[in-house]
Design a protein with these regions (language model features):
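Alpha-helical transmembrane segments and their membrane-interface junctions
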Residues: 98-118
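Membrane-helix interface/capping segments
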Residues: 60-85
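Alpha-helical transmembrane segments
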Residues: 43-62, 127-129
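Membrane-interface helix termini and inter-helical loops of multi-pass transporters
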Residues: 28-41
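Alpha-helical transmembrane segments of multipass membrane proteins
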Residues: 14, 18-22, 54-62, 104, ...
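Alpha-helical transmembrane segments and their immediate juxtamembrane interface regions
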Residues: 107-108, 121-148
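Select subsegments of transmembrane alpha-helices in polytopic membrane proteins
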Residues: 8-18, 91-102
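Cytosolic-side membrane-entry/anchor segment at the start of a transmembrane helix
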Residues: 1-31, 138, 142-148
Length: 148
């Protein structure tokens, strides 16, 4: 398995893990009555800002651990140089990710128009981001295996 494929698999699992853990913590706080997710939209803003910070720090730690383990396992200290093919794969994967995010967000607006509570839109944003990231990394794996 190539370095790029391993990196994308780590990205997919880290995105799912970070989002699931953070969502579980927030849900437990909601059940305990610490925060009211149904009516307090200020809390949603704080939740998103904290989630972004937590996600960035967790990703940095995960990437460092991944590079250390990969260097030990493959005995390669340098990361592969990004060439034209890598840039094309990233470009096509990013396009797929943007399309997915747009469709998910528009679906959230449609559900909102049909009576979904407003707090559901915040949940739709989180799900849209997670699904689009999975699509982006999955697309990269697909394009690397398929070849361009």
């Amino acid at each position: 398995m190539s370095y790029q494929e391993k990196k994308n698999i780590v990205n997919i699992f880290s995105a799912m893990l970070i989002t699931a853990i953070y969502a579980w913590i927030i849900y437990q706080k909601h059940l305990a009555g610490t925060i009211n997710l149904r009516e307090d939209f200020t809390s949603w803003g704080m939740i998103f800002l904290i989630f972004i910070g937590v996600s960035i720090v967790a990703r940095i730690v995960i990437y460092i651990i991944f590079h250390i383990i990969n260097a030990i396992a493959t005995r390669e200290t340098d990361t592969p140089v990004e060439d034209e093919r890598d840039k094309m794969v990233k470009l096509m994967s990013t396009r797929n990710s943007y399309y997915t995010f747009s469709v998910c967000v528009m679906s959230g607006f449609v559900l909102l128009a049909f009576g979904m509570p407003v707090y559901g839109m915040f949940i739709a944003f989180v799900i849209s981001g997670l699904v689009s990231e999975i699509v982006e990394n999955g697309s990269q794996i697909y394009y690397y295996r398929k070849g361009l």
